[in-house]
């Protein structure tokens, strides 16, 4: 190249071009790409006035305007990418221009739309104001109770008849389309309304569409003339019926979350009851248990009415010695029957408090735990239990392996953020094994914690609910613990939960027996049905292959009718769940969670349905490390098998599209779309199975807290704590921090009005950010540090509300990226014999995706560039 350019170009231009070529090569471009990049640059110099100020502004904003094109590492077809992205930017810029006369009508529509949104936002307050005078009146108060019940019965009967007509009325394709457009229009109108009315309306619309779909499936879509099609169709219909039941029960469960708030305790502390705190442990490391005990010692409660117990089912001498040193009680069993339930029941023989609070050994309570929860027990004498959320300050395997910690609601956020709050409305909150307070008298009446199943917590409160006792839930995190460290441990925990809930369903079915209210029965059944999702999810992941591979019509209907029934059912359910669950579960993430677990919970739940006494309790490991990133091939094997199976379906589908009957082309397309969606979800499951590094023994917790540090010469620096762990802190100094590098300092933290001092070493300094490593602490200093950090009353309060609202389309894009990431990991970690195949496929997809235009990365300086671009 240098010889050719030396011959064609003058020396200064040649030198600059050679420098550009070397820069391209230094950034990883191939010789061909670098040469071609230089050629495109020469053409740009010839035909484009790059020295013009407008072009200079565009070049300055290259990273914002062309985020997917690396100017330092050119690719052969970059000019095509520039052309596509430029057209995209010009279209976007033209849309933002000031409306011209011919577009005034459109501008008027925008104004109407804005006024409509404002009116909808103000509607709930207006309705509340207009009907305020009716709050203390009954519209039918002058009628007898019997007459009111009769009127209510007539209204309900009329509503049911109308609903039955809406569900069962057959429509031709055009009528079905018009009906769906009407419902969709109403949904779009009400979804922006704040308050619960819009959620209730969306539930009604979703149930109408979903019930029509299920009715249509049962009455019009089974092929009774073909045995293979009939069997495959019935299998899919079974899975769809399960999903429909869970959808209906889920809507019922969360239709009106209670959002219970604390009740103040009496000022006279002599009226406060005595409480025993149980911390059961079996094989966990002492360092995991220490923080829980240290935090329990600092709980704001009269010390003469608070007893802390370590329930050591491992019988370890170091635990006994630790309990003696810190002044808590210690119990070790000689026999170990019934695992955790037996351990707690054994301790109940010795503890004499009026209430018992149970914490898993890694759950660190806040100082306010009892003051926030005990007031309700004094107010309601029939209240047997107050449950609070299980909050985790470390990422679970999904969050860590996908890099989504505190960016996307985790798997448990939906349950503890919404479902238990909904259960509380129906008096169906059940015990979750930790972070709860239980009244001793009702617990003693049923013989302590239930031991017949491996989910003893839920079973215990099913029994108490049958006896007429109530339970409560407060959605304010008052303790935090460690999430499971590996995907295999996470799956093992979920297998135990699934087996236990199915055992309860078989041994103490909430649908039968005395004592439960109808709403309680439904809530318990939904909790148990949730863990039966394994087989239906596997059916959905393989269902389209029945048509592609075996020519079995699983839905015996024209492709147009399938689209007119299936898509509205899915879209309405997604829109409604996004409205209800948006803060607690983002759209499409349930498919990822269920797919990862499906293969593993299907066999144990099936076995538990047949033989509920089979199975054993397994302890979930906490506090482990992951030294190196790796693919868990044992866990991911089922996902890879399903991926290969669906890829076979893709190959057969392509062949059938080109060589099959023309009348089936649309059905093949519908099936292929389903297969590609399944491949995306399976790719996400594969991505989760890539274990990311976890080399910190102490997890960092982000928080903002004022503090100060003192040098050995007594000089004080005010600072703000940004994060902390059991071994150190990250702080931000208000001033120059370089002078502290390598020094020994004292960290000053406050708890209430009292100040505590902790010795520390400055480990790193970056600007005004300082990393502190705690020096060896005495036992009392360690207790004080835990109570100043982990056990602060406000440490976890805002975590549940920190997630962004769900946006279904953006969430779908996240899932697409996640699926592709899974296949890239397969290409990276696959055996050499198949690595080449995966690498070619992922490279091909990456190459195609690289041409898709991107939304500019907006900055304050980007706007002039947009204007310059639009003027070229």
Language model segments and positions:
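Structured alpha-helical
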Residues: 7, 13-15, 629-872
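Long helical/loop segments within the catalytic core of UDP-sugar-dependent glycosyltransferases
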Residues: 253, 331-355, 367-454, 465-466, ...
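N-terminal membrane-anchoring/stem segments of glycan-assembly enzymes
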Residues: 2-271, 523, 533-537, 659-689, ...
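A conserved acidic beta->alpha catalytic loop
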Residues: 312-319, 335-336
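The conserved acidic donor/metal-binding loop of glycosyltransferases
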Residues: 360-364
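Catalytic donor-sugar/metal-binding loop of nucleotide-sugar-dependent glycosyltransferases
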Residues: 463-479
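Cell-envelope/extracellular polymer assembly enzymes that use nucleotide-activated donors
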Residues: 274-276, 307, 459
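Short, acidic, metal-binding catalytic loop of nucleotide-sugar glycosyltransferases
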Residues: 294-305
């Amino acid at each position: 190249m240098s010889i050719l350019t030396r011959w064609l170009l003058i020396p200064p231009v040649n030198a600059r071009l050679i420098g550009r070529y070397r820069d391209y090569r230094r950034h990883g471009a191939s010789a061909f790409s670098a040469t071609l990049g230089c050629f495109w640059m020469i053409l740009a110099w010839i035909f484009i006035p790059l020295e013009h100020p407008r072009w200079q502004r565009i070049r300055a904003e290259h990273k914002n305007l062309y985020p997917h094109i690396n100017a330092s590492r050119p690719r052969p077809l970059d000019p095509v990418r520039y052309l596509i992205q430029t057209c995209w930017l010009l279209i976007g810029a033209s849309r933002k221009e000031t409306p011209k006369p011919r577009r005034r009508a459109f501008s008027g529509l925008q104004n109407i739309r804005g006024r409509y949104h404002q009116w909808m936002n103000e509607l709930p307050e207006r309705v509340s104001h207009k009907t305020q005078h009716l709050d203390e009146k009954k519209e039918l108060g002058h009628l007898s109770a019997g007459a009111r019940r009769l009127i209510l019965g007539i209204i309900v009967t009329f509503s049911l008849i109308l609903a039955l007509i809406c569900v069962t009325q057959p429509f031709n394709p055009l009528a079905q389309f018009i009906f769906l457009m009407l419902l969709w229009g109403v949904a779009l109108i009400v979804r922006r309304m704040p308050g619960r009315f819009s959620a209730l309306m969306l539930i009604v619309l979703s149930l109408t569409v979903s019930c029509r779909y299920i009715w249509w499936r049962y009455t019009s879509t089974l092929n009774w003339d073909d045995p293979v099609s009939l069997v495959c169709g019935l299998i899919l219909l079974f899975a769809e019926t399960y999903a429909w039941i869970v959808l209906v029960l889920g809507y019922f469960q969360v239709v009106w979350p209670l959002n219970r708030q604390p009740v103040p305790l009496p000022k006279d502390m002599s009226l406060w009851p005595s409480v025993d705190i149980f911390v059961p442990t079996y094989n966990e490391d002492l360092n995991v248990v220490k923080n829980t005990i240290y935090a329990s010692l600092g709980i704001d409660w009269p010390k003469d009415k608070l007893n802390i117990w370590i329930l050591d089912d491992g019988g370890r001498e170091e635990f006994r010695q630790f309990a003696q040193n810190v002044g808590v009680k210690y119990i070790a069993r000689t026999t170990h029957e019934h695992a955790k339930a037996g351990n707690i029941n054994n301790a109940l023989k010795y503890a004499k408090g009026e209430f018992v609070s149970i914490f898993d050994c890694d759950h660190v309570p806040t100082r306010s735990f009892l003051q926030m929860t005990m007031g309700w027990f004094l107010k309601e004498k029939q209240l047997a239990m107050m449950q609070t959320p299980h909050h985790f300050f470390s990422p679970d395997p999904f969050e860590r392996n996908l890099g989504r910690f505190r960016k996307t609601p985790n798997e448990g956020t939906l349950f503890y953020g919404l479902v238990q709050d909904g259960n509380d409305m129906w008096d169906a909150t059940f015990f979750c094994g930790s972070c709860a307070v239980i009244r001793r008298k009702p617990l003693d009446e049923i013989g302590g914690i239930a031991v017949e199943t491996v989910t003893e917590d839920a079973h215990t409160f099913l029994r108490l609910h049958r006896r007429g006792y109530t339970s409560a839930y407060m959605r304010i995190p008052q303790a935090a613990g460690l999430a499971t460290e590996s995907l295999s441990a996470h799956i093992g925990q979920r297998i135990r939960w699934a087996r236990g809930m199915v055992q309860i369903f078989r041994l103490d079915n909430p649908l039968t027996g005395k004592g439960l209210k109808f709403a309680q029965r439904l809530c318990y059944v939904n909790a148990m049905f949730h863990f039966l999702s394994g087989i239906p999810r596997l059916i959905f992941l393989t269902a389209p292959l029945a048509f592609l591979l075996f020519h079995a019509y699983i839905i015996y209907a024209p492709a147009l009718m399938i689209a007119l029934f299936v898509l509205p059912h899915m879209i309405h359910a997604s829109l409604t769940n996004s409205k209800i669950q948006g803060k607690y579960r983002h759209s499409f993430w349930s498919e990822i969670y269920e797919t990862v677990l499906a293969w593993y919970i299907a066999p144990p739940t099936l076995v538990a349905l047949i033989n509920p006494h089979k199975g054993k309790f397994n302890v979930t490991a906490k506090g482990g490390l992951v030294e190196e990133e790796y693919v868990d091939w044992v866990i991911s094997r089922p996902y890879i098998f399903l991926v290969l199976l669906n890829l076979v379906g893709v190959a057969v589908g392509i062949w059938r599209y080109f060589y099959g009957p023309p009348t089936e082309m649309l059905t093949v397309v519908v099936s292929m779309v389903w297969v590609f969606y399944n491949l995306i979800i399976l790719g996400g499951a594969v991505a989760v199975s890539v274990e990311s590094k976890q080399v910190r023994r102490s997890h960092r917790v982000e928080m903002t807290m004022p503090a100060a540090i003192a040098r050995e010469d007594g000089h004080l620096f005010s600072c703000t704590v940004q994060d902390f762990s059991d071994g150190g802190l990250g702080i931000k100094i208000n001033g120059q921090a370089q002078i502290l590098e390598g020094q020994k300092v004292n960290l000053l933290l406050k708890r209430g009005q009292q100040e505590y001092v902790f010795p520390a070493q400055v480990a790193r300094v970056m600007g005004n950010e300082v990393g502190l490593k705690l020096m060896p602490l005495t036992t009392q200093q360690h207790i004080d540090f835990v109570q100043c950090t982990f056990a602060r009353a406000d440490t976890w309060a805002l975590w549940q509300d920190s997630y962004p609202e769900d946006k279904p389309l953006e969430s779908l894009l996240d899932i697409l990226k996640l699926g592709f990431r899974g296949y890239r990991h397969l290409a990276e970690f696959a055996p050499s014999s198949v690595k080449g195949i995966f690498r070619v496929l992922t490279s091909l997809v990456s190459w195609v995706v690289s041409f898709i235009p991107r939304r500019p990365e907006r900055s304050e300086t980007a706007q002039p560039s947009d204007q310059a671009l639009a003027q070229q």
